[in-house]
Amino acid sequence: MKEFHLHKYPVTSVEGNEYAVSIYNDRHSKGFVKVSLYKKVRGFFRKEKFKCLTREGDFAPSYFEEKWDYDYIQMAINEVINYENSIKEQINHENKQKAAIEKFEAWSGQEV
């Protein structure tokens, strides 16, 4: 199988966030591709670079090409949606945890 590496920037989500998406063939499994998601950031000396938001390399999310009907666009969209949903879940978890901590600290220690 011929090796390939697809890269697209910007990929704009429904939320309006811009990401870079890389899709490349899996070196170890035939018929699978890896999809990595990146965000543009400024590094030292204000130099722009891309920070990986998902795993990359051998640990990147895998997609079976046949199952996805070789639709790399849908794979990229799915990865963006998964990432944004995980961020929403994380924020929701942190808010609930913060409320529970405040409730615990306000508790007098008396049994109910």
Curated annotation (Swiss-Prot):
Superkingdom of the source species: Bacteria
Protein name: SPbeta prophage-derived uncharacterized protein YoqB
